[in-house]
């Protein structure tokens, strides 16, 4: 079977999958990748198999799209370019996802909570943090609960 025939008959599978996963931002890129994969799958499909071509394509394309999502999640680095730069000749700044989340968290916290979180992330125990901050252990526990509550409220 020629690929044009396969494409004309089964192109709706690609649109369905992209709609199923609410892909709107990089629609064309995902469409192109799925189209290439559809061509590859049409080359290896055996009509003598028990599975129809449409179910074969749907299953394989669905799993391929999921694999693409997983690959994208493994790319944790984000490039942030300066807004005031008219050209992209400047060196971009790299932040990983954890740094960006920490920045968001730090914006929510007051000074004491930020200091507690910084010390906690550096590996200090609660009693050590209490000594460094010159606060009681019960106050440190209250700060910890406050940070936890703010994070859960804003990020869950």
From Swiss-Prot:
Residues 126-145 bind DNA. It holds the Pfam family Sigma70_r2. One of its GO terms (biological process) is DNA-templated transcription initiation. GO terms for molecular function: DNA binding; sigma factor activity. Induction: Autoregulated. Keywords: DNA-binding, Sigma factor, Transcription, Transcription regulation. The keyword Transcription regulation applies. The keyword Transcription regulation applies. It comes from the Bacteria. A motif (Polymerase core binding) lies at residues 29-44. Disruption phenotype: Cells lacking this gene display a decrease in viability during heat shock, long term survival and starvation experiments. They also exhibit significantly reduced virulence in a murine model of septic arthritis infection and decreased capacity to colonize host tissues. Sigma factors are initiation factors that promote the attachment of RNA polymerase to specific initiation sites and are then released. Sigma-S contributes to the protection against external stress, thus playing a role in cellular fitness and survival. Belongs to the sigma-70 factor family. This is RNA polymerase sigma factor SigS. The lineage of its organism: Bacteria, Bacillati, Bacillota, Bacilli, Bacillales. The gene is sigS.
């Amino acid at each position: 079977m020629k690929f044009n025939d396969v494409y004309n008959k089964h192109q709706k599978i690609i649109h369905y999958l992209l709609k199923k996963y609410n892909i709107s931002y990089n629609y064309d890129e995902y469409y192109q990748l799925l189209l290439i994969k559809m061509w590859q799958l049409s080359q290896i499909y055996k009509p003598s198999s028990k599975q129809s071509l449409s179910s074969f394509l749907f299953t394989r394309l669905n799993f391929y799209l999921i694999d693409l999502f997983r690959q994208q999640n493994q790319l944790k680095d984000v490039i942030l370019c300066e807004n005031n730069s008219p050209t992209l000749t400047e060196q971009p700044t790299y932040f990983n996802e954890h740094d960006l989340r920490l920045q968001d968290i730090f914006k929510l916290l007051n000074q004491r909570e930020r200091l507690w979180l910084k010390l906690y992330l550096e590996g200090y125990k609660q009693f050590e943090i209490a000594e460094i901050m010159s606060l009681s252990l019960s106050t440190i526990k209250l700060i910890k609960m406050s940070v936890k509550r703010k994070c859960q409220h804003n990020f869950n």
